[in-house]
Amino acid sequence: MTTTKKFQQVKDLTVYPSLQPTIEVIPTDGYNGAHRYRLQLCTGFDSKKNTHNYIDKTTTIQFVQKNDDGSITPGLQSEQLALILLDRVKKLNERYPSEYNNIQIEGLTMYLQACKERIDDRINRGVMGELQK
């Protein structure tokens, strides 16, 4: 018998200034939902209502997951998603320069550097790719 995995809203993951939860996970995956996210799509910001407009369509992001039995669920790496965000902010900053964009670029660059350092540490300790701390 196949069990259906149920997505649940994550109430504290909202996009400012909206109060509407638009991100869901499957919290019973053994990682509290850290590998698959379902997101409600947005059509932009409504300046009259001072909030984002969300529609009844979703997209799913699956992160790579090594399971306890050694099997792997293919998916994105966190760094790939961060690189996409960094590329997007840099390109938008070319068209609409902003000090806030520069702060985002700095933050994403710091995140990627921390990822690199963590990977280097795990490689040096011989645990990269293993389910070990």
What are these regions (language model features)?
Residues M1-K48:
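Short, charged/polar N-terminal "headpieces" of proteins
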Residues G30-G33, G44, G70, G75, ...:
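Residue-identity detector for glycine
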